[in-house]
Amino acid sequence: MGYLKRFALYISILVLIVMVAGCGKSDETKEDSKEEQIKKSFAKTLDMYPIKNLQDLYDKEGYRDGEFKKGDKGTWTLLTSFAKSNKPGEIDDEGMVLFLNRNTKKATGYYYISKVHDEFNEKEHQKNIMLNLKIIKIVLLDNVEDEKLKQKIENFKFLSQYADFKDLKNYQDGSITTNENVPSYEAEFKLNNSDENVKKLREVYPITTKKSPVLKLHIDGDIKGSSIGYKNIEFNFSKVKDEETAVRDFVNFGPSDENS
């Protein structure tokens, strides 16, 4: 009788161990899935959105590694662009790039306008309009005669200033692409037009298609973090030829340029 009790206790303990191990393995599988890794990697940056005051980045630390020189506090780089095909075979692409140097606490950048020829994937011309950031205002350094363009630049907002990715963890069943040799990682999630970020983009940009977009999260470099790699997000509303429409956003922290 004592043997049966001991055997029953042994079986109970064994079952408990298997259950605990099974739960642990399930969590590990979830943790180790590429989708989860990509979302966690992006969350480090996207958790900062929306950045109401860009100058707060002067006091914001980012991912650091051996690429930084001693004493370098690093530089934040922001980019937001809108690309749309308005003419067969051509894509108009324009946006803003801003460098916020944490050493000098100065922000410089430019607004660019370019035209890409679809057939050759070449830029016919790119015009860069130099600018800087004073307090919370964009100040043009170049003369802009087109009043409409001038207003657009001075009132420009980066996606990182109004987007909110608090629901990133809820995006499911992403299409995953990886290349360990580069390395690069990509996750695509289908969104609805009811998504708050999508609504805001439709308010800001002349997006004519009614198609709901695909959100693409792209990483070049170590998925755990790298100052020489980069991450960018893209809301792709249409990939149809001559109807291409996309919004791209990039927030990166890296070593400062000695000349900046």
Swiss-Prot record:
Pfam families: DUF576. This is Uncharacterized lipoprotein SAB0390/SAB0391. It is found in: Cell membrane. A lipid is attached at C23 (N-palmitoyl cysteine). It comes from Staphylococcus aureus (strain bovine RF122 / ET3-1). Residues 1-22 form the signal peptide. Its main location: membrane. Belongs to the staphylococcal tandem lipoprotein family. GO terms for cellular component: plasma membrane. It comes from the Bacteria. The keyword Membrane applies. Disulfide bonds: none annotated. A lipid is attached at C23 (S-diacylglycerol cysteine). NCBIfam families: SA_tandem_lipo (TIGR01742). It is a lipid-anchor.
